[in-house]
A protein has these predicted regions:
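Outer-membrane beta-barrel transmembrane domain signature of Gram-negative proteins
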Residues: 2-4, 149-253, 500, 510-518, ...
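Transmembrane beta-strands of outer-membrane beta-barrel pores
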Residues: 3-5, 20, 33-37, 72-76, ...
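Repeated loop/turn-to-beta-strand initiation elements of outer-membrane beta-barrel proteins
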Residues: 22-28, 62-68, 109-116, 128, ...
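Flexible loop and strand-edge segments within Gram-negative outer membrane beta-barrel domains
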Residues: 34-113, 123-146, 165-171, 691-693
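Membrane-embedded beta-barrel scaffold of Gram-negative outer-membrane proteins
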Residues: 117-121, 131, 293, 325-448
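Structural signature of Gram-negative outer-membrane beta-barrels, strongest in the C-terminal barrel
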Residues: 228-366, 370-375
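Gram-negative outer-membrane beta-barrel transporters
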Residues: 247, 395-571
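C-terminal beta-signal and adjacent terminal beta-strands/loops
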Residues: 376-378, 386, 559-634, 639-645, ...
Length: 701
């Protein structure tokens, strides 16, 4: 039995094993109850969970090892009426889980196969979130819920109302794996070959997000049942060979493997959803005190599900608005569904990793060093694509066709042609007057933004990791362990990013989109790369006190180096340039720091969708001045970083008799939370964790 407590969580768990007798196997069981509060000083939001786990194991005919397990959790979150919250608001979550797994190992021990392993699993998560919210506005607001392209009259939300939102998620996943192992020996040469296949399916059979009263759903909401989203199936096959060869007193171990994967999603536009990942490892054990090892591998990663199967989004553009009666309003919007665009030039992201390590023992001290270099090619990023878009703005006519003045009725009825956008108004109190057409006041030309999955420039990462374990200091029975890691990362994005200024002239939208070196498409970012390096170290002291059956562990965590530098480079030259607050060039290198910086586009797109190079003529034309992007501060290219900071964790375990053990832990037990200032901005921040503690009691019967 285990009892655990900390300021937010209380848990009790008990486990018991049952021997079912000769040849009947073993049954292990576990039950636990957990209750957690979000804020101990205001426990109005709480989470509780009751869990039960059963596992059965048996061996049949000495060659079939069978295992079956099932786990069930029943829980949820509940927000009671908080006196500090709006009365009537609440939030509840149902969180139930059912997991089942089985495995079978067949010890064949034949000349052509040693063993065959099979396992399968099913995971079902039933999560229903319900939230009731109080909404207060100064006036009625429009809400658009149309799902087809066209023109629609917006629904009007009342100024004051309650809305209840449901999010119904029923994640249902399956998996199965099959592996064959073939172990062979030729004298002192040993071979361990594996070949296997796996299948995994991930999907959701829930109803998704919906509202109890659909007419009170917020602006922009559209129903999206999860059952409309297809399952994602992944099929993988792999082969691996490990060969151990003695070389005198030394031993050489070679491992080579290849993994192929294929992802299947119904109706995806990406057909070649397959990847191939080879790897190779070498381990040369020279003697008991020295081992050298190395590895190389390539891993391909497919885009996320939302890229392979993009879900619909909606663009709602207001085209008509009018007031009538006693403060009432009517709005018409043009709705345009869109998705993440298909990119037929998209390449799969590829990580190539190489590492070299050495393990040595000097006296009683063990040392492990690993150096690595990782290059990510074709990293994924979402890019923006702008295309010209025009629409008609409608307004109330000042006169009727016969020349008489027209005023909006106090009790009007509205009708809109969803295809043409024509709007008609009729007086409900005088239907015989007929439908009056609203007039086109202007045609707006602008750009709309679409996104697509793209590839960025390579990202390089390299570093060194080490572990030093010192021999025990016998007089105080204490062992020290020092570990740390140094990492360096650099990338320069030489792709493109688009930015569309939000400025307007004479009521018209800006007529150009700027195309820049990839600054993320931001209006105030002038860098397209970054380099970072960091050094973290930890020192752990573990003391054993056998006389009182106690173990004390003290861990000091230190971040000694944390540095970064923004970069602006293109073909070996600085892309950004220094400017003053009025955007006038000032000269010098951007890396001198303490200066505003700016960038010009490399190209621009006009309202006809044509792309043009951006030349000195455009730089000197005031019509293009809005395409000059200036940094939001004068320290964008100052070297940044922080002074070292530290924290310490304490753990104590005490055994009481043969049946009870008590464990206490305290993270950052000195409550060291210093403010450290940024070298670039001077802004201070705290990076060490909050002081946190807990107690666990274990009972053995």
């Amino acid at each position: 039995m285990t009892l655990s407590t900390n300021p937010r969580t209380k848990q009790i768990a008990a486990s018991k094993g049952f021997d079912l007798g000769r040849n009947h196997g073993v049954l292990n069981s576990n039950v636990e109850y957990t209750r957690a509060t979000k804020n101990p000083t205001s426990p109005y939001t709480s989470y509780s969970r009751t869990g039960l786990a059963l596992n059965y194991q048996n061996t049949f005919a000495k060659v079939l090892r069978f295992n079956f397990g099932v786990t069930a959790n029943i829980g949820g979150m509940n927000t009671e009426d908080d006196p500090d919250a709006q009365k009537g608001e609440w939030e509840k979550v149902r969180d139930n889980v059912l997991r089942a797994n089985t495995s079978l190992k067949w010890l064949l021990n034949r000349s052509w196969i040693t063993s065959l392993d099979f396992d399968a699993s099913l995971n079902y998560t039933d999560n229903l979130a319900r939230k009731r919210t109080y909404n207060l506005n100064s006036t009625s607001l429009p809400a658009v819920h149309a799902e087809q392209e066209g023109y629609y009259i917006a629904e009007m939300l009342p100024p004051v109302y309650y809305s209840t939102k449901y999010v119904d998620s029923k994640q249902l996943d399956y998996a199965a794996n099959l592996k064959a192992t073939w172990v062979r020996s030729w004298g002192d040469v040993h071979s361990n070959a594996k070949v296997g296949a796996s299948w995994r399916a991930n999907g959701n059979v829930g109803d998704g997000e919906y509202y109890v009263t659909p007419s009170l759903a917020p602006n922009g909401y559209r129903p999206r049942p999860y059952t409309d989203i297809p399952y994602m199936h992944n099929l993988a096959a792999y082969v691996e060979e490990t060969l151990t060869v003695p070389l005198g007193s030394a031993t050489l171990q070679l491992m080579a493997g290849l993994r192929a994967e294929k992802t299947f999603i119904k109706n995806t536009q990406y057909e070649n959803t397959s990847s191939l990942s080879p790897r190779f490892n070498l381990k040369f054990r020279i003697n008991d005190r020295l081992t050298v090892r190395g590895g190389w591998g390539i891993t391909e990663k497919l885009p996320s599900f939302n890229v392979l199967y993009p879900l619909p989004e909606y663009r709602d553009t207001p085209v008509f608005a009018t007031n009538y009666g006693s403060g009432q309003s009517a709005y018409v919007y043009h709705t345009q569904p869109y998705r993440i665009l298909y990119n037929d030039n998209l390449k799969w992201q590829r990580n190539r990793n190489s590492e070299v390590g050495v393990d040595l023992r000097i006296g009683g001290t063990s040392i492990s060093l690993v150096g690595y270099f990782n290059r990510t090619k074709y990293p994924y990023k979402l890019s923006a694509a702008f295309e010209p878009f025009s629409y008609n703005m409608m307004g109330v006519p000042s006169t009727l066709p016969d020349g008489t003045a027209y005023t909006m009725p106090a009790n009007p009825a509205f009708r809109v042609d969803s295809q043409t956008g024509e709007i008609f108004v009729r007086d409900k109190d005088n239907p015989s007057a007929g439908w009056i057409a609203m007039q086109t006041t202007s045609t707006k030309r602008t750009f709309v933004k679409n996104t697509y999955q793209n590839n960025g420039s390579p990202v390089d990462r390299m570093g060194l990791e080490f572990v030093v374990e010192f021999p025990q200091i016998n007089p105080i029975r204490t062992q020290l362990r020092l570990d740390g890691a140094y990492g360096y990362t650099k990338y320069v994005n030489e792709g493109e990013a688009c930015y569309y200024p939000s400025t307007s002239t004479g009521g018209e939208f800006y007529p150009y989109v700027g195309v820049y070196l990839d600054n993320g498409g931001s209006s105030n970012v002038t860098y397209n790369g970054r380099k970072l390096h960091a050094l973290d170290m930890n020192l752990t002291a573990t003391t054993h006190v056998p006389s009182i059956r106690m173990i004390i562990s003290l861990r000091l965590e230190a971040t000694l180096v944390k540095r970064s530098q923004n970069l602006s480079e293109y073909r070996g030259r600085e892309y950004a340039f220094n400017v003053d607050e009025d955007r006038n060039p000032t000269g010098g290198s951007i890396y001198d720091g303490d200066s505003y910086t700016a960038i010009w586009p490399v190209a621009y797109i006009d309202l006809d969708g044509n792309r043009h190079p951006f030349t000195d003529a455009e730089k000197n034309d005031p019509a293009f001045s809005s395409l000059l992007l200036r940094s939001g501060n004068a320290y964008s290219f100052n070297g940044d970083g922080y002074d070292p900071y530290f924290s310490a964790n304490l753990s104590i375990t005490k055994e009481i008799g043969d049946h009870v053990s008590v464990s206490f832990y305290a993270n950052n037990f000195t409550n060291s939370r210093p403010f450290v200032a940024s070298y670039a901005t001077g802004v201070k921040a705290v990076f060490t964790p909050d002081f946190y503690y807990g107690l666990t009691v274990r009972l053995k019967f």
